[in-house]
Amino acid sequence: MNLHQFRFVREAVRQNFNLTEAAKALYTSQPGVSKAIIELEDELGVEIFTRHGKRVRSLTEPGRIILASVERILQEVESLKRVGKDYAAQDQGNLTIAATHTQARYSLPAAIAEFKKRFPKVHLSILQGSPTQVAEMVIHDQADLAIATEAISDYKELVSLPCFQWHHAAVVPADHPLLERKPVTLDDLAQYPLITYDDAFAGRKKINHAFALRGLSPDIVLEAIDADVIKTYVELGLGVGIMADIAFNPERDRGLRLIPVGHLFGSNVTRVALKQGAYLRSYVYTLVELLSPTLNRKLIEQALKGEAESYEL
């Protein structure tokens, strides 16, 4: 048995049991993948996959147990590689961050700027996606950490820690009647067409829930995945924007005004997610600490080992 066989098993599952796609992902041949998996099954004395003819269909019951072991072994192998790299070069390497647009655009820049001052030789990559997508990037080892508000705390494969709180705000043109309402109510907002986030982003469920509790059905004329799009269409007069307050910049958004509405929708928590049991290079801890001063290396290490008590802001 060898690591290549383990990788073939894992990739077959990731590719929805399509061995041709698994072979492409691992830059090898489909017959080679099929043969290696059969040899592993023969050595273990059990079938890992159910088959219909020559086609792999699903995991068998022992296959599920084997997959869990394979995942752990391959993660440990990656951790060993990182340990070696860490000690060979403490202040250089690669760091990939997966983040939603709002976090990449508004939360990360200050932390990244300070990080690059401290670690100029570390190559940074930022991948953007939905909360679900960035979580899966970490799970599948495509990113070292994920930053988002939703979804990332829902995966058992991840450890998520709170970074900071933020609230929703209404954004309107400088002469909008809502600026005269203090405080703004849900009934006030419901009088206007609304522009806000897609259902998968930035606390949209809280917005929907608040209106539903009030018995209101707001006219949401446009949904977007980032705040810049929301602000653009507010400027065009299409409606009132509801977005994260951290995405408003008075200097850049001079034609708009921000109205706090946190009292209507409650607070939201941006979280950083790391893979359960992962080995992190020292500079990853530094970046997490820059994102949230309330976090430190000891707390992060305890959380990764499952030793930390539930920690919230």
Curated annotation (Swiss-Prot):
HTH lysR-type domain boundaries: 1-59
TM region positions: none
DNA-binding region(s), residue ranges: 19-38
Recorded GO MF terms: DNA-binding transcription factor activity; transcription cis-regulatory region binding
Induction: Negatively controlled by both CysB and SsuR.
GO biological process: cysteine biosynthetic process
Keyword check for Cell division: no
SUPFAM superfamilies with a match to the protein in the record: Periplasmic binding protein-like II (SSF53850), Winged helix' DNA-binding domain (SSF46785)
Pfam annotation, one family: LysR_substrate
Keyword Transcription regulation assigned: yes
Keywords tagged on the record: DNA-binding, Transcription, Transcription regulation
Gene ablation phenotype (knockout): Mutant is not able to utilize sulfate, sulfite and ethanesulfonate for cysteine biosynthesis.
Family, per entry: Belongs to the LysR transcriptional regulatory family.
Role noted for this protein: Transcriptional regulator preferentially involved in the control of sulfate transport and reduction. Binds to DNA at target promoter regions.
Name of protein: HTH-type transcriptional regulator CysB
Natural source organism: Burkholderia cenocepacia (strain ATCC BAA-245 / DSM 16553 / LMG 16656 / NCTC 13227 / J2315 / CF5610) (Burkholderia cepacia (strain J2315))
Species classification: Bacteria, Pseudomonadati, Pseudomonadota, Betaproteobacteria, Burkholderiales
Gene this protein is translated from: cysB
